[in-house]
Amino acid sequence: MDPQQWLLLEVSLEAIQHAGLVPGQSLARDTGVFIGISTDDYKASQLYSSDLSRIGTYTGSGCMYSAAAGRLSYWLGLQGPNKAVDTACSSSLVALHDACQAIRHGECSTALVGGVNLLLTPHLFVCFSALGALSPDGVCRAFADGANGYVRGEGCGVLVLKSRAQAEADGDQILALIAATAVNQDGTSSNLTAPNGAAQQQVMRTALQRAGVSAAQVGYVETHGTGTSF
């Protein structure tokens, strides 16, 4: 089984416990699961290996993105919407947006939202190096004159989401509020993998408008970028 699936199970249980919830009891059965996942190193090493003896009964389900999300609902007995999201670097944020929409539309009362990324083989490193996307000296200098590429990273994170009204009614500890989310796409840019500044500005304006917040009120910004002159 893809270690990313193992990690999601472990971190999801940690998130549920940290939220003071118990699967099968206080964790609602209609809880949705939304997982951002876009790296398939383990799948490539198992299913696409020339050694077919490495493929077993559960290799397929152990490698599928859909199973990374589905396994959580299976083990936790959850019957809300379930989806794995692959939008490359934005996968977990788009999963978060989808979860917020599902809660707002009454599709689930609670949502597990997560993202996972493990780097298990050299193949994508070679690909991104050929593309010129990786920093040759292993340092990401986003927004700096000397920016020469980004650095890949690993990790896993899971959040437990509810509407504010539901969380307050349940007496939950609220760590943060999501004022609004927004999603769009670059459309046409200089090339397929290059960002479109105008489109990115528009999605931020949309999120601010939905939240009823002005740009001047924002005190902290966390961004994702290419770490290059783009």
Task: Give residue spans per PLM region.
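Condensing-enzyme catalytic core of the thiolase-fold
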Residues: M1-F230
